[in-house]
């Protein structure tokens, strides 16, 4: 599932991007003016703080730094808005070409709460979401967006926000019926004795108990653990052939911590893929590359969703919709935290 980048750039999207050149230039000019005049205004304020007759110690440098950050942020505002306009235009055009929809703003739903409850996401104190892609994928309801989760760490002057998760949350209707709740989690997530002992026999998720499901494949047990409230159905969902596929999937997304929750007829996937879909640029010559990169990033996410999904016979949907049995490497893997997409699917 990949957009026709060449067709988009030679058609309506390319024409629209050409029309945005004036907007880009005006945004740059406005930003430069803001930086110039606010910088002039900030200089005497910084001098006053620096040469106060009483000693503020280190705090005076913090005030000057805060003043400089304020000048930069205010000046960058027009550029930020221009890049967002370009990004929304490009991503919306890619989505239309794929027959789905795109929205920059996201209102997380039940899938987000389920991902939190069952441990697909780490604990956090601040979160934000953006870049929602939704519609149908291989005939199944599909919803994807990015999440950025942070925790406050340190103390005193070393107190700071630290990213604990930045990646994609994918919610897709599963291709075969099931009634249980089954969790595919990273190895070692749930242990006895407050995390100090060996693997637990069961885990509690907000009052919902899931029991450990034995898997005989040593390579699988070295990476994943399966937890479920229905041992029989869990083994039907994660059967021997599917286990082999999950091992290959982990190899393809090496280091990106794929995990999934099967519940209520759908599968919810979390993957630490970094910051994606940033197609907005102030330089028109970058547009074609940005469109191609964003298109490939979404295609890789779609391949991941179909690679985890199954049809009614328990076969992987991705294998049903292509002739090659092996994953195909992406043409231009995206960059960013977590190294997502190095080998593609």
What do these predicted regions represent?
Residues 64-88:
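Transmembrane alpha-helices and immediately adjacent membrane-cytoplasm interface residues
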């Amino acid at each position: 599932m990949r957009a026709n980048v060449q067709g988009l750039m030679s058609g309506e999207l390319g024409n629209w991007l050409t029309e945005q050149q004036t907007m880009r230039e005006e945004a740059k000019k406005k930003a430069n003016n803001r930086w110039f005049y606010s910088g002039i205004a900030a200089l005497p304020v910084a001098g006053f703080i620096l040469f106060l007759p009483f000693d503020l110690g280190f705090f005076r440098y913090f005030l000057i730094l805060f003043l400089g950050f304020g000048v930069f942020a205010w000046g960058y505002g027009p550029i930020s808005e221009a890049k967002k306009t370009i990004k929304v235009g490009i991503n919306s055009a890619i989505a239309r070409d794929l027959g789905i929809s795109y929205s920059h703003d996201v209102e997380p739903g039940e899938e987000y709460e389920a991902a939190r409850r069952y441990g697909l996401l780490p604990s956090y104190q601040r979160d934000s979401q953006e870049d929602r892609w939704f519609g149908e994928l291989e005939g199944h309801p599909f919803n994807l967006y990015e999440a950025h989760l942070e925790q406050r760490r340190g103390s005193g002057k070393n107190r700071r926000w630290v990213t604990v998760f930045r990646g994609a949350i994918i919610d897709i209707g599963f291709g075969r019926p099931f009634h249980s709740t089954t969790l595919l989690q990273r190895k070692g997530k749930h242990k006895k004795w407050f995390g100090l002992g060996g693997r637990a026999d069961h885990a509690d998720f907000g009052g919902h108990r899931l029991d450990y499901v034995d898997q005989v494949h040593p390579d699988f047990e070295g990476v994943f653990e399966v937890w479920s409230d229905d041992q029989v159905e869990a083994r039907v969902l994660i059967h021997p052939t599917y286990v082999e596929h999950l091992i290959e999937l982990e190899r393809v997304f090496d280091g990106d911590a794929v995990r999934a929750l099967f519940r209520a007829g759908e599968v919810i996937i979390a993957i630490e893929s970094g910051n994606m879909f940033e197609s907005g640029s102030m330089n028109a010559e970058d547009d074609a590359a940005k469109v191609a990169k964003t298109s490939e990033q979404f295609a890789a996410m779609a391949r991941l969703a179909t690679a985890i999904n199954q049809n009614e016979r328990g076969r992987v949907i991705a294998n049903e919709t292509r002739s090659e049995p092996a994953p195909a490497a992406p043409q231009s893997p995206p960059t960013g935290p977590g190294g997502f997409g190095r080998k593609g699917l």
